[in-house]
């Protein structure tokens, strides 16, 4: 019995060179073709589609980023121009208001000077009139005093 066991042990080792080895090789090759046709090609196609999608999305994102940066710089330039225009309008308004202030001040000063000059002329006229009246009264009083002195003698 032992000899039968030893005799049977020589078969069925690691590699048996009988019909199973080529059959296994054919099965592996056939399985490779089937997996390639049914699994690897569709998966590869999906991976390529996703890679194309990611690439196109990345390119679109770069274009949109460039467009956004361009729009941002345009808006910054427009804002800068608007600020400069607003500052120009403010400066012009300040200049106009300063000119109006100076004109109003000059007009008020001229009116005040005219009123003062008119008042001075009126005062001079009244003073001259009062002096003339005073001279006239002094003359009359002097004549009256002379008459009374002459009459009392």
Curated annotation (Swiss-Prot):
- Membrane topology annotation: Single-pass membrane protein
GO terms (molecular function) for this protein are: proton-transporting ATP synthase activity, rotational mechanism; proton-transporting ATPase activity, rotational mechanism
What is the predominant subcellular site recorded for this chain? membrane
Alphabetic keyword roster: ATP synthesis, CF(0), Hydrogen ion transport, Ion transport, Membrane, Thylakoid, Transmembrane, Transmembrane helix, Transport
Membrane-spanning ranges: 20-40
Q: Which GO terms describe its cellular component?
A: plasma membrane-derived thylakoid membrane; proton-transporting ATP synthase complex
Q: Which CDD domains match?
A: ATP-synt_Fo_b
Compartment(s): Cellular thylakoid membrane
Superkingdom to which the source organism belongs: Bacteria
Entry function:
F(1)F(0) ATP synthase produces ATP from ADP in the presence of a proton or sodium gradient. F-type ATPases consist of two structural domains, F(1) containing the extramembraneous catalytic core and F(0) containing the membrane proton channel, linked together by a central stalk and a peripheral stalk. During catalysis, ATP synthesis in the catalytic domain of F(1) is coupled via a rotary mechanism of the central stalk subunits to proton translocation.
- State the oligomer form and interacting partners: F-type ATPases have 2 components, F(1) - the catalytic core - and F(0) - the membrane proton channel. F(1) has five subunits: alpha(3), beta(3), gamma(1), delta(1), epsilon(1). F(0) has four main subunits: a(1), b(1), b'(1) and c(10-14). The alpha and beta chains form an alternating ring which encloses part of the gamma chain. F(1) is attached to F(0) by a central stalk formed by the gamma and epsilon chains, while a peripheral stalk is formed by the delta, b and b' chains.
The entry assigns this protein to a family as follows: Belongs to the ATPase B chain family.
Q: What is this protein called?
A: ATP synthase subunit b'
Which species?
Prochlorococcus marinus (strain MIT 9211)
UniProt gene name: atpF2
């Amino acid at each position: 019995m032992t000899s039968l066991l030893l005799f049977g042990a020589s078969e069925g080792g690691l590699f048996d060179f009988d019909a199973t080895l080529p059959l296994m090789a054919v099965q592996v090759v056939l399985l490779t073709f089937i997996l390639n046709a049914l699994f690897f090609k569709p998966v590869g196609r999906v991976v390529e589609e996703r890679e194309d999608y990611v690439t196109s999305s990345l390119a679109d994102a770069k274009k949109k980023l460039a467009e956004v940066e361009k729009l941002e710089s345009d808006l910054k330039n427009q804002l800068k121009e608007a600020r400069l225009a607003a500052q120009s309008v403010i400066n012009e308004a300040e200049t106009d208001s300063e000119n109006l202030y100076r004109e109003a001040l000059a007009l008020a000063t001229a009116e005040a000077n005219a009123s003062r000059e008119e008042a001075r002329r009126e005062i001079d006229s009244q003073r001259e009139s009062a002096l003339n009246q005073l001279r006239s009264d002094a003359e009359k009083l002097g004549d009256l005093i002379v008459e009374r002195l002459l009459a009392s003698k």
